[in-house]
């Protein structure tokens, strides 16, 4: 939950739990689901159809039970922040519609007992490094 060194370390050590049931029945029709998907995209400032997002906003109340009224998420429930432009399952309309329609089961087991503190620390450093821009190659002197 988050990209800080401590957050990465906690995710590796303690695991993560994020289960979202299919919500199509609660949201409504296929058009309602697509409108909610446009609203979800609007929360992160991503490209979306503003008129469809406006229609989806009231239906987002179903989603707000876990994601919050502003879409900021709830770590205890495993509901991700929808405002941060971090998309684990694709950021397009079709990917979001699929998540609303089919749900998701995103569980990561805890690894602290298996790896131990030192290896969790090293793995967290490695994962953090994956999110950093690669440094420019150092110039080498000619022969």
What is the predicted function of each stretch?
Residues 1-45, 74-132:
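Extracytoplasmic electron-transfer domains, predominantly the class I c-type cytochrome c fold
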Residues 48-73, 84, 97, 101-102, ...:
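Sequence/structural segment immediately N-terminal to covalent heme-attachment motifs in c-type
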């Amino acid at each position: 939950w988050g990209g800080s060194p401590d957050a990465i370390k906690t995710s590796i050590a303690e695991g993560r739990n994020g289960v979202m049931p299919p919500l199509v029945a609660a949201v409504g029709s296929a058009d309602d689901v697509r409108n909610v998907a446009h609203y979800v995209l609007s929360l992160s400032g991503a490209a979306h159809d503003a008129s469809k997002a406006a229609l989806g906003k009231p239906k987002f109340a179903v989603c707000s039970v876990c994601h919050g009224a502003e879409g900021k998420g709830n770590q205890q429930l495993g509901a991700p922040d929808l405002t941060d432009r971090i998309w684990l399952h694709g950021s397009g309309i079709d990917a979001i519609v699929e998540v609303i329609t089919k749900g998701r089961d995103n569980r990561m087991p805890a690894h602290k007992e298996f790896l131990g503190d030192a290896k969790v620390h090293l793995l967290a450093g490695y994962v953090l490094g994956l999110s950093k821009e690669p440094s420019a190659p150092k110039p080498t002197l000619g022969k």
